A protein has these predicted regions:
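Short hydrophobic/charged patches on amphipathic alpha-helices used for structural packing
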Residues: 1, 21, 66-69, 113-114
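Short beta-strand-centered segments that line the small-molecule binding cleft or hinge
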Residues: 1-52, 118-121, 138-141
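Hydrophobic hinge/microswitch elements
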Residues: 1-5, 11, 83-139
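Secondary-structure junction motif
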Residues: 11, 39-41, 46-97, 163-166, ...
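Beta-alpha-beta core module
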Residues: 16-27, 111-159
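Short hydrophobic segments within beta-strands
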Residues: 32, 78-80, 155
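A late-sequence structural motif
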Residues: 38, 139-181
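Short amphipathic alpha-helical segments
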Residues: 73-76, 101, 150-153
């Protein structure tokens, strides 16, 4: 609003603002669950491993997706704090499933939530981009819901001129992530 930031990233769906937006990439929100949780036995036909996510199996049309979060009604969750886009999405996903989640903890950083799931503290919503190494600490679940896909844009003021370095940055990052748009 005050034009103090040159560029930022944002994933607000259907923004109604006057900012210049360049779509960069999409990520997919998954439910990450510690391997030891019994829900994994119930949903074994939907469970994905870290290797599956690393090889982008979750993006394949034949990859099974949970139709609702209803089976997770008794699973404790680690949620992000209010104000975070993923918090808003998780609230909407729970509401659509008509469940009142068990919130074990709220944290401000997605990476913190991810590591707490690795430690067995609860389930969490994570980005598929976070799964960077093969491990057996958790299972992942693709969610069949429009809110489970986020488009990230580079955002800048439409009132300000884009400098050559800003344009070069946007072009560089756009070409790098183009396959993921």
């Amino acid at each position: 609003r005050e034009n103090k930031i040159d560029l930022t990233f944002n994933c607000i769906p259907n923004p109604k603002d006057n900012f210049r937006r360049t779509p960069i990439f999409k990520d997919n929100v998954l439910v990450a669950v510690p391997t030891s949780y019994p829900i994994n036995n119930t949903l074994k036909n939907y469970a994905l491993t870290a290797r599956d996510i690393m090889f982008r199996r979750n993006l394949m049309p034949d990859c099974p997706a949970i139709p609702s979060l209803a089976p997770f009604a008794d699973v404790p969750f680690i949620l992000l704090t209010k104000g975070n886009n993923l918090y808003s999405r998780s609230v909407a996903l729970f509401e659509d499933a008509k469940i009142d989640p068990i919130v074990r903890l709220q944290v401000s950083q997605l990476v913190t939530a991810y590591h707490l799931v690795c430690s067995g503290l609860g389930a969490a919503f994570i980005s598929d981009w976070m799964v960077l190494y093969d491990h057996d600490d958790m299972r992942y679940y693709k969610i069949a819901h429009p809110l489970a896909v986020r488009q990230f844009d580079v955002v800048s003021s439409s009132r300000n001129y884009l400098s050559k370095p800003q344009k070069a940055f946007i072009e560089s990052i756009s070409s790098y992530y183009h396959p993921y748009l």
